[in-house]
């Protein structure tokens, strides 16, 4: 699953694969699916919104599409303007499909391990 967006006049590719979860965990020492689930809960209570998780997920999708992207701080500093919520909104379909696929695969793996 891939998507290209224009951010600050630059074409940026975003991609989600099975490796995205590992990349996210290794970079941020946090579980992607748990953080994504917490974002869903924040819809009911915006005070619980973890803005850093959104930034981290966006970076992980970009890094998956382009391994040459630098660390998150350097990458975000490369933009004069970036609307995180606009980017997140544009990536919502990619994120939804990815999470559906990942949770489906995780469920299958758990069932196979139990048998």
Residue ranges with predicted function:
Residues 14-16:
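Short capping micro-motif at the N-terminus of alpha-helices
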Residues 1-11, 30-52, 64-115:
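Charged interaction scaffolds used for protein-protein
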Residues 18-28:
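N-terminal first-folded block
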